[in-house]
């Protein structure tokens, strides 16, 4: 009682018949003024504070009675007014090192090609750029380089756009195979290969970027997407070869083998592969890969056994694509070293979830998996694991005569330090406590319910949605197949997102994770008015 505070008014805690309560002493906002803490006065502005009026800076004097105009920020130079200061936002992005940045590298990753009419590798690859800035246009440039590795770079502009505030732009880009296939051909190369096939995406203001492979659901049977991470967010140790990534991957379930229990079709064998794809962003970048999967030889890379090492020097636009040649091959736990920023993707041309050791256990069907990996420095200790929207329920609501079943989600957690990690979840039984012994050690978790995961040491966390059969949707109905997501730790959640739901899909879902007290709005509507919110245990 007697304590003072500032809101839009000067308020004092007073004793009332109902107990202690805040009461208004003076309504500053009604006078067009603000409350000054400690002085408990209504003033025009907070003494010695700065703010923005559009792109003009305003400075409050020492008394709070007047404001003066400062400089006008030059948006043509990538400068915008933030907190009363003219700020070079791309330079600020280098300090903040988040997933919002000014330089990205995108790659048309290897996808499934299993015959006429089933060639996902040839379908529309796209990059989507969203502008999260509230007040400035983002000028975006996308480039490719048609020279070959080892030659001097000669970037070519392939697309430009001015993206309005809080908007996005879809860039439909041409195919650029990374598996050594000649232009116009798909899956005819050496699989493991060195190409100059990356796209560079730059902006004069920080943006968010995604890639879709392919984009639209038009005769699509194998697709996924990646959240791209900017160069500003990557691990950097110029001139010093340092561990940059511990790989989170997934077993490659479709491959021709000599084992009839795992060979999908002996008369017409289908070889699909897991991949680890490394993109150079700076000249003369040394890269070393300690692989946990056998690598098929191709280009400058010899056949490399599990536990072997691959080393190469990359330049801008160079793509070192490493691929497997075996059933259940899996790059998980591999370590990528680099002495300058490199972008790393992991995935599969197409694979199933759950994975299996015998075809009799398969839960159809497979799908393309891909994700740009997060660098080691972003590993965290506290995560929220969520379950995809129940597809059998949605298909039943759309009129199909099927029952609704509990839909599992598959998760993988991996240790990134030599000390390993001790994992605790809010699940019961054997999944409540997990022990990871050393760098690259991982554990798989299956769950039909949301849960919290905490670790005593930094880890990376991934989810893979279930194949259609595993989700209880019969083939022939629109049930969907696996997709992979790198789950960020709670400490890295953002306050706003601008995103795309691609066209021509039967169902679109958005999963929102937020603290219980958060106010969440989707396109102007409170989320609580659109969908039911579920509390996650823990």
Feature roles, as predicted:
Residues 1-95:
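Cysteine-rich, disulfide-bonded extracellular modules and peptides in secreted proteins
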Residues 4, 49-50, 87-137, 142-333, ...:
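Conserved functional hotspot residues at active sites or interaction interfaces
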């Amino acid at each position: 009682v007697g304590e003072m505070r500032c809101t839009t008014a000067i308020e004092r805690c007073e004793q009332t018949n109902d107990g202690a309560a805040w009461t208004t002493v003076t309504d500053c906002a009604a006078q067009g003024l603000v409350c000054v803490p400690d002085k408990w006065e209504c003033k025009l502005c907070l003494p010695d504070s700065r703010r923005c009026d559009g792109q003009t800076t305003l400075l409050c004097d020492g008394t709070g009675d007047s404001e003066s105009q400062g400089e006008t920020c030059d948006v043509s130079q990538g400068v915008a007014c933030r907190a009363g200061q003219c700020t070079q936002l791309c330079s600020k992005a280098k300090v903040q090192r988040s997933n919002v940045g000014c330089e990205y590298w995108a790659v048309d990753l290897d996808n499934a090609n299993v015959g006429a009419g089933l060639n996902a590798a040839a379908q529309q690859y796209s990059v989507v750029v969203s502008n999260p800035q509230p007040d400035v246009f983002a000028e975006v440039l996308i480039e490719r380089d048609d020279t070959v590795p080892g030659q001097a770079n000669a970037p070519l502009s392939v697309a430009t756009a001015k993206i309005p505030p809080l908007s996005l732009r879809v860039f439909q880009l041409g195919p650029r195979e990374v598996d050594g296939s000649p232009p116009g051909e798909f899956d005819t190369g050496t699989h493991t290969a060195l190409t100059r096939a990356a796209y560079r995406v730059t902006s004069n203001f920080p943006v968010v970027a995604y890639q879709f492979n392919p984009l639209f659901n038009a005769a699509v049977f194998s697709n996924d997407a990646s959240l791209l991470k900017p160069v500003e967010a990557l691990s950097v140790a110029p001139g010093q070869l340092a561990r940059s990534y511990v790989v989170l991957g997934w077993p490659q379930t479709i491959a021709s083998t000599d084992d009839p229990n795992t060979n999908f079709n002996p008369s017409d064998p289908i070889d699909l592969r897991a991949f680890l794809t490394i993109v150079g962003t700076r000249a003369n970048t040394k890269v070393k890969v300690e692989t946990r999967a056998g690598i098929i030889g191709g280009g400058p890379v010899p056949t490399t056994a599990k536990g072997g090492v691959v080393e190469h020097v990359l330049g801008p636009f160079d793509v070192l694509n490493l691929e497997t040649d075996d059933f259940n091959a899996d790059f998980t736990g591999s370590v990528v070293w680099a002495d300058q920023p490199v972008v790393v993707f992991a995935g599969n041309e197409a694979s199933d979830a759950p994975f299996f050791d015998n075809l009799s256990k398969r839960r159809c069907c497979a799908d393309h998996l891909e994700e740009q990996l997060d660098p080691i420095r972003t590993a965290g200790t506290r995560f929220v694991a969520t379950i995809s929207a129940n597809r059998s329920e949605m298909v039943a609501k759309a009129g199909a005569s099927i029952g609704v079943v509990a839909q599992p989600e598959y998760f993988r957690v991996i240790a990134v330090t030599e000390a390993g990690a001790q994992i605790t979840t809010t699940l019961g039984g054997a999944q409540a406590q997990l022990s990871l012994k050393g760098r690259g050690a991982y554990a798989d978790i299956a769950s039909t319910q949301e849960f919290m995961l905490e670790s005593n040491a930094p880890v990376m966390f991934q989810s893979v949605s279930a194949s259609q059969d595993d989700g209880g949707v019969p083939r022939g109905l629109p049930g969907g197949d696996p997709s992979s997501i790198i789950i960020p730790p709670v400490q890295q959640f953002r306050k706003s997102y601008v995103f795309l739901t691609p066209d021509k899909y039967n169902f679109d879902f958005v999963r929102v994770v937020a603290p219980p007290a958060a106010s969440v709005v989707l396109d102007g509507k409170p989320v609580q008015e659109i969908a039911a919110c579920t509390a996650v245990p823990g």
